[in-house]
From Swiss-Prot:
Its cofactor is Mg(2+); Ni(2+). The gene is cca. This is Multifunctional CCA protein. It comes from Pseudomonas fluorescens (strain Pf0-1). ATP binds at residues 8, 11, 91, 137, 140. A single active site specifically recognizes both ATP and CTP and is responsible for their addition. Keywords: ATP-binding, Hydrolase, Magnesium, Metal-binding, Multifunctional enzyme, Nickel, Nucleotide-binding, Nucleotidyltransferase, RNA repair, RNA-binding, Transferase, tRNA processing. Pfam families: HD (PF01966), PolyA_pol (PF01743), PolyA_pol_RNAbd (PF12627).
Length: 409
């Protein structure tokens, strides 16, 4: 029995990055031998075990053969005769196909260390094209290591392009796709993930609504970058630079989908793009079964981001309606995330990344004013039921009018 550290742990150590999760591969062992040593079996499809003390994953060396469509369409074979090299060749990228023994002696049959040094994301073998999930994984690695200068090898991008055209991407489950998308969006440069998907034709398959934004112009006076797709990438980039949560990043990606529906004769204006985009945002949300908080914020930002930009001009009554749409009294954090998404939208414009966004503090102040209206005096006056709600609304409107006047003076 020989045990090797494999995959990401080896890659990240060689890159000088912190190693968090460690995976191990066991060569020359049987399931019975692993159980006898106290390992706990957890793999449903192939022999994977948890170490009795560390809880880390140990997998028996295995080979795999394509047997059906999609991510799960594989037949696995694990036995003591499977070599380390045979196990490593089934992995996606050369930088993930290295192994180390307990003395840190490197086994690198597919030149992963060379590709690390040359900053290349390269597939290990033609079998790469058998697993459509790898398109998303490579794009995610491109986002993760963009700051180090990593690029996807042209021949790997070509395989990703073939996969995108094959129909295999449609076989991915919503859950697997969302897992990769959400992880990619939380990388330091998530816009690279979207760009790589576009470069290989996968964006057109997975998120045609986002792909449709590229080449659609906007008024240069407001958007010096002009292209709606490039603007979306910039907004997403800003959300990462400002360390925003997944909810905000997802909303930033989807906020302008309605612009892809504007007839060419109306370009570069996009009248009512907020409302038009809602059905597209809903479709993308449902396609990937995004978490409820991500779905809700994306729809609200899509519908109201122009309100956010025009906050200083809004009538007090419109401002109150905006606050109520977000249920700001019970869910203040959601409104805060909306404000931040609007600010990222404003900053995601060429040359305007550092421009101040006074609308943010104005909206926060308005929310505080509305929340500050006390209910008790109205109860003491005898208001109850629907009448209490209307009275509370009137008092909040009065308070917002005063707030608006004081902010203008």
């Amino acid at each position: 029995m020989q045990i090797y550290k494999v995959g990401g742990a080896v890659r990240d150590r060689l890159l000088g990055k912190p190693v968090t999760d460690i995976d191990w591969v066991v060569v020359g062992a049987t399931t019975e031998e692993m159980l006898a040593k106290g390992f706990r079996p957890v793999g449903a499809d192939f022999p994977v075990f948890l170490h009795p003390k560390s809880g880390e994953e140990y997998a028996l060396a295995r080979t795999e053969r394509k047997s059906g469509r999609g991510y799960g369409g594989f037949t696995f074979h694990a036995s003591p005769e499977v070599t380390l090299e045979e196990d490593l060749i089934r992995r996606d990228l050369t930088i993930n196909a290295m192994a180390e023994d307990d003395q840190q002696n490197l086994t690198d049959p597919y030149h992963g260390q060379r590709d690390l040094e040359e900053r290349i994301l390269r597939h290990v073998s033609p079998a790469f094209a058998e697993d459509p999930l790898r398109v998303l994984r490579v794009a995610r690695f491109a986002a993760r290591y963009a700051e180090l200068g990593f690029k996807v090898a042209p021949e790997t991008l070509e395989l990703m392009r073939q996969l995108s055209e094959s129909g295999e991407l449609e076989a991915l489950t919503a859950e697997r796709s969302w897992k990769e998308i959400s992880r990619a969006l939380m990388e330091d440069q998530p816009q690279v993930f979207i760009q790589v998907l576009r470069d290989c034709g996968a964006l057109k398959v997975l998120m045609p609504e986002v792909d449709a934004l590229f080449g659609v112009p906007q008024p240069e006076a407001h958007h010096p970058e002009i292209d709606s797709g490039l603007h979306t990438l910039s907004v997403l980039e800003q959300s990462a630079l400002h360390k925003q949560p997944l909810t905000v990043r997802w909303a930033c990606l989807l906020h302008d989908l309605g612009k892809g529906l504007t007839p060419e004769e109306e370009w570069p204006r996009h009248i009512a793009h907020e409302h038009k985009g809602l059905k597209l945002i809903k479709a993308v949300n449902e396609r990937f079964k995004a978490p409820k908080d991500c779905q809700e914020l994306a729809l609200l930002v899509g519908q109201y981001h122009t309100h956010g930009h025009r906050a200083l001009e809004l009538k007090a009554s419109t401002l109150l309606e905006l606050l109520q749409s977000f249920d700001v009294y019970r869910r203040p954090q959601r409104f805060e995330e909306f404000i931040v998404a609007c600010e990222m939208d404003a900053r995601g414009r060429k040359g305007l990344e550092q421009r101040s966004y006074p609308q943010a503090d104005y909206l926060r102040g308005a929310a505080n004013v509305a929340r500050g209206v006390a209910v008790q005096p109205l109860l003491e006056k005898g208001f109850k039921g629907p009448e209490l709600g209307e009275a509370l609304k009137r008092e909040r409107l009065k308070a917002l009018k005063v707030y608006k006047e004081s902010a203008a003076s």
